[in-house]
Amino acid sequence: MTIQRPHPTAAAPAASAEIELKLALPGADPRTVGEQMAQLPLLADLAPVQQKLRNIYFDTPAQDLRQQRAALRLRSLRQGSGKTRWLQTLKTAGTATAGLSQRGEWEAAVHEGQLDPVALQGTPWPTLDQDGQWLAQLAPCFETESTRTLRLFTADDGSRIEVVLDVGSVRA
């Protein structure tokens, strides 16, 4: 589940504060979990959206981003039979309190399957890559592919709560 609120100090319009509660369900049947989620009173009236996701995560050979608790990814997203969109996302180190994770996230549309340095402008990237050497060293380190079932709930205060079930795989 993800809760997104406008980020009070965001330098870029695509920045948001993200609070996540992630649950791992090892051994659970995804179909059964999906059916049970659909019966929850909060979700019963919300139409599910199916998406196909492919994520490519990048880092330097020395794993500099991982050491800074940051992540840079490219995501291809296809909803239904629609066109595939590519998004580049930078996530920064966050905090965890009572099982909830909160971290900064900056997302921008990019050309198919290619990192775009321009999309990192207005993000904390210059703070992470202070000497400007990491960008040239970035390479894919792992990929995920999944089918996402998403239900979006908007609270009275404007917060968006995404309730998501991802079923997929990770490849290194």
Listing of model-derived features with the role each one plays in the protein:
Residues 1-172:
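Phosphate-end processing signature that detects enzymes handling 5′-triphosphorylated RNA
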